[in-house]
Amino acid sequence: MVLVTQNAPNFIAPAILKNNQIVEQFDLKKYSNGQSTVLFFWPMDFTFVCPSEIIEFNKLHSEFKKRNVKIVGVSIDSVYVHQAWQNTLPKNGGIGKINFPMVSDVKHDIQKSYGIQHPNLGIALRASFLIDSNWIIRHQVVNDLPFGRNITDMIRMVDALDFHNKFGEVCPANWKKGEEGITASSEGVSQYLSKYS
C-alpha cells in the first residue's frame, strides 16, 4: 500500500523510551509534537539484519535531531523484549542503549495500518516512513526481509524535504544537501539539463 501524500495513521501503544522507561500509552502524534518524524518498522528483535539497522539509526540519531526530526521504531515484540534487547551488548546479538522510542505492536494493528505486514509470516517488512510536520507521509521505502535499509539515504530525504519546503525547488536524481535543485518549470528543467549537453 502506498501512503505517500496521505495522512500518517496515528497510534497509541506501549513503548520503551530512551531513558529505559516503559510507557503504556505512547502517542505517536503527540510525541512528534509538530516535528517531522521517521517511523520505521523491523520484523523482530534478536534477529539478524534488524540490529544493524537499529544501531545505525541510533548512531545517526544526532544527525536527525539537528534537523529537528524525531525517530520512532516499531516491531511486534513486547516492550520487555525491547528492553532485554537493549540490555544485551551488540557483541552478544543485542543493540545496547537506544536514543529513540521503541514501540510494541503485539497485536499487529500498527503494521497493518501502514500496510506493511508480511503476507505469510505476520511480521513487519522493513519499512520506513518520513512524516512531515503537517502529518503527511512524504517518503516511504519497503524492503523484503533479507535486505537492510540505507539509513543515510533517509537523511538525504529529510534534507530534500527541507530544501523543497525552503526554496520550492524539486530535487533531481542523487541530489544531496548543498547541491542545486530544479525550478519546477519547463525553463527550469531545460536550464538544469543543459549542463549534460
Curated annotation (Swiss-Prot):
UniProt keyword Phosphoprotein, yes or no: no
Positions of the catalytic residues: 50
GO molecular function, one term: thioredoxin peroxidase activity
InterPro entries for the chain: AhpC/TSA, Peroxiredoxin, Peroxiredoxin_AhpC-typ, Peroxiredoxin_C, Thioredoxin-like_sf, Thioredoxin_domain
Subcellular location: Cytoplasm
Residue ranges occupied by any Thioredoxin domain in the UniProt entry: 2-163
GO CC annotations on file: cytosol
Catalytic activity: a hydroperoxide + NADH + H(+) = an alcohol + NAD(+) + H2O
GO terms under biological process: cell redox homeostasis; cellular response to stress; hydrogen peroxide catabolic process; response to oxidative stress
Function per UniProt: Thiol-specific peroxidase that catalyzes the reduction of hydrogen peroxide and organic hydroperoxides to water and alcohols, respectively. Plays a role in cell protection against oxidative stress by detoxifying peroxides.
PANTHER family with a match to the protein in the record: THIOREDOXIN PEROXIDASE, THIOREDOXIN-DEPENDENT PEROXIDE REDUCTASE, MITOCHONDRIAL
Note: The active site is a conserved redox-active cysteine residue, the peroxidatic cysteine (C(P)), which makes the nucleophilic attack on the peroxide substrate. The peroxide oxidizes the C(P)-SH to cysteine sulfenic acid (C(P)-SOH), which then reacts with another cysteine residue, the resolving cysteine (C(R)), to form a disulfide bridge. The disulfide is subsequently reduced by an appropriate electron donor to complete the catalytic cycle. In this typical 2-Cys peroxiredoxin, C(R) is provided by the other dimeric subunit to form an intersubunit disulfide.
Name this polypeptide is given: Alkyl hydroperoxide reductase C
